[in-house]
Design a protein with these regions (language model features):
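Topogenic and prosegment regions of secretory-pathway hydrolases and membrane enzymes
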Residues: 1-23, 27, 104-116, 139-144, ...
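Active-site-adjacent substrate-recognition loops and nearby beta-strands
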Residues: 3, 146-166, 170-187
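Structural recognition of the beta-strand scaffold that forms the well-ordered cores
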Residues: 17-21, 74-79, 110, 115-120, ...
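Residues that line or immediately flank small-molecule/substrate-binding pockets and catalytic motifs
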Residues: 39, 82, 121, 170-173
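Sequence contexts marking disulfide-bonded cysteines in secreted/extracellular proteins
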Residues: 42-44, 108
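Residues at helix-coil transition
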Residues: 63-64, 98, 111, 192
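Substrate-binding/access-modulating region of protease and related hydrolase catalytic domains
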Residues: 84-163
Length: 192
């Protein structure tokens, strides 16, 4: 993926704060040794071991010393109830504000000084709160990247890449071809 060329040019993520809104991150994973990861989750999450897989692997792709795209960046992790994790008892319950909701987490990330917000999800949730949170990020110069999804289908209406200001990302395999599981669509800006 030409990481050696990027690093030779000094592109390591130094001075960049990335907000990752995803499942829990197992910071004790060997590949994350030495990475600058801060858990900024607004509520606790009781996790099952398998619930950490996606968040941990996404964090490693970003900041792992050996193969991360930006190993010198600071990663702020905002945990969701993705996977088999469940929200802790300090969550504000139904009828109130769910602090684990994506609009709230996006706003937390902006307030915490994120330069980039990465969303590893696709969703048909087009709520006003989510639209306003993304619009606020874009208006403040925060770059938002979002997965095209893993449904192996044209997902024009279920990923955020087609929203103005959001960089849609599909997946490629080691040969640079679209990964068999990756979704695609008009909102895809790049592939990684």
């Amino acid at each position: 993926y030409h990481l050696d060329q990027a690093r030779a040019k000094g592109y390591t993520g130094q001075g960049v704060t990335i907000a990752m809104i995803d499942g829990p991150v197992e910071t004790s994973a060997p590949e994350l040794s030495g990475a600058a990861i801060i858990d900024n989750s607004p509520c606790s999450i009781e996790k099952a071991p398998e619930a950490t897989a996606h968040g941990t692997s996404t964090a490693a792709l970003l900041v792992a010393r050996d193969y991360g795209v930006v190993p010198d960046a600071t990663l702020h992790a905002y945990r969701t109830d993705a996977g088999d994790a469940t929200l802790g008892s300090d969550r504000i319950g139904s009828g109130g504000v769910n602090l684990a909701g994506y609009p709230s987490l996006i706003n937390h990330a902006i307030n915490d000084g994120a330069h980039i917000i990465t969303l590893s999800l696709s969703s048909s949730d087009h709520s006003d709160a989510l639209r306003w949170a993304i619009a606020r990020a874009v208006s403040q110069g925060v770059l938002i990247t979002a997965s095209a999804g893993n449904e192996a289908q044209d997902s024009n209406d279920s990923h955020f890449g087609w929203w103005s200001g959001v960089v849609g990302v599909s997946a490629v395999d080691t040969n640079g071809a679209r990964a068999s599981y990756s979704s695609w669509g008009q909102g895809v800006t790049t592939a990684a």
